[in-house]
Each structure stands twice: as C-alpha cells, then as structure tokens.
C-alpha cells in the first residue's frame, strides 16, 4: 500500500507541504527573535505573537469553505492547484527572506496559513477514496506520522539554515525547491472525482457559525479526544 500510486505521491506531497510551512514559519520567527532583521516596526514579542495568530486565523475563517471545496471537486486536481498556489507564495516568501522584509513575511505567513487551511480537509477526504477499507487505519497512521515528523524536521532545519553562512539565501532557495518538489509529486496523484454535486459557496462567517454548532455536538466533540 505505502508505495502504491494510490498513496505514495499523496504522502510525499503532504509531507513536503508540512515541512515547507514549518521551515518558513520558523525561519521568520528566528530571524525576528534573534534580531537578524533591522528596523522592525513593532516589538519582537508583539511580532512573534502576531505571527502565531496570523498563521492560525485562516483555519478559523476558511476551514468550513475548504471542506465544502474538497467535497465539490476532484481532489487530485484541487491538491495540484493548492501546490501551485504554495509555489507562488513561497516564491514571494523567498524574496522576503532574502531581503529581510519582516512585514511582507508576515503577510505571506497568513497566506501560507490560508493555503494550509484549504489543504487540510482535502488531505483527509482523499484517503477514503484512495484506500481500501482495510487500509484506511494504516493510511491515516502514516499520514499522522509523516505530518508530525515533517513539522519536527522543519523546526530543526530552520535553525540549522540560519546558523550557516548565507543562511537566509539558502533558506530562500529551500522553500522554493520544496514547493516545486511538492507540485511535481502532486502531479502523480491519480484522479479522485467528487462524489457530490453541490457547489461550494464562499461564506466564511456563516461557515464558521455552522462549524461551531457542529462542535457543540457531544459526539463530534468527543472525536477530538
């Protein structure tokens, strides 16, 4: 199962995405925390808290719409589109890292969070279509392990990159390279047609309200633990 075309390209794609997000986020935080960026318009503590909030905010705003989008279109096609968006964002992020533009990096961090918010639902919605029922638990386990391992490696890599000479320039190249590899991997994900005829409507506020209503359901809330 692991090396099958049904699973492996998708697994590599999502791991590279998690790795890239965390390298970029931690490069930004480390550059600010250790004063590698001059003329920061706000205090370091405020900047770090703002960065954390801006990365998480899209998950509250867009998760409901992201889930509807994941249900309404071919999942492989959606992943490829999201990886192209990631490539565009990281190309801008590479410039921001190289020029040490803190505020631009902050804006791009929000965009990275938004891209991740849309990738999350399709990442899990694809598995039941791609895998056999008896493979689903194993597939979920691989995805969880790959995601958290990628997060850990991303956190460690950010510090190592900035510790070497010309680290910011190398970090700029790394985030672009990982985005490109992620897109190339996504091209090999087989078609996963939508099983729904409903079209997704962009209603972030009402979507958030509906999500909170579902969260109040005891059975749904219990699934979190």
Task: State where each predicted segment sits.
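Juxtamembrane intracellular "pre-TM" segments in multi-pass secondary transporters
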Residues: 1-8, 192-225
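Residue-level signature of transmembrane alpha-helical entry/exit and packing/kink sites
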Residues: 6, 10, 44-48, 101, ...
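Substrate-agnostic recognition of the 12-TM MFS/MFS-like secondary transporter fold
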Residues: 8-25, 51-89, 104-163, 178, ...
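A single, central transmembrane helix in multi-pass transporters
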Residues: 15, 19, 25-26, 30-32, ...
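Extracellular/periplasmic helix-loop-helix junction of adjacent transmembrane segments
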Residues: 27-59
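Transmembrane alpha-helix termini and helix-breaking/packing motifs in multi-pass membrane transporters
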Residues: 27-39, 94-99, 151-175
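A helix-boundary/kink motif common to multi-pass secondary transporters
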Residues: 37, 44, 74-75, 101, ...
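Cytosol/matrix-facing ends of alpha-helical transmembrane segments
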Residues: 115, 167-203
């Amino acid at each position: 199962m692991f090396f099958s075309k049904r699973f492996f390209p998708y697994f590599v794609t999502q791991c590279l995405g998690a790795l890239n997000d965390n390298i970029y986020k931690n490069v930004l935080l480390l550059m600010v925390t250790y004063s590698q960026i001059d003329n920061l318009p706000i205090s370091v503590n405020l900047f770090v808290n703002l960065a954390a909030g801006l990365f998480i905010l899209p998950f509250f705003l867009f998760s409901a719409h992201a889930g509807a989008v994941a249900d309404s279109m071919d999942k492989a096609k959606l992943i490829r589109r999201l990886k192209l968006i990631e490539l565009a964002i990281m190309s801008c992020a590479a410039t921001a890292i190289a020029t040490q533009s803190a505020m631009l990096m902050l804006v791009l961090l929000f965009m990275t969070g938004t891209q991740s918010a849309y990738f999350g639902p399709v990442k899990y919605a694809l598995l039941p279509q791609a895998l056999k029922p008896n493979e689903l638990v194993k597939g979920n386990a691989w995805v969880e392990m790959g995601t958290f391992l990628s997060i850990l490696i991303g956190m460690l890599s950010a510090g190592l990159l900035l510790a070497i000479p010309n680290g910011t320039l190398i970090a700029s190249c790394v985030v672009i390279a990982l985005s490109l590899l992620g897109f190339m991997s996504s091209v090999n994900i087989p078609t996963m047609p939508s099983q729904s005829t409903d079209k997704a409507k962009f209603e972030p506020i009402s979507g958030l309200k509906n999500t909170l209503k579902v969260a109040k359901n005891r059975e749904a809330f219990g699934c979190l633990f």
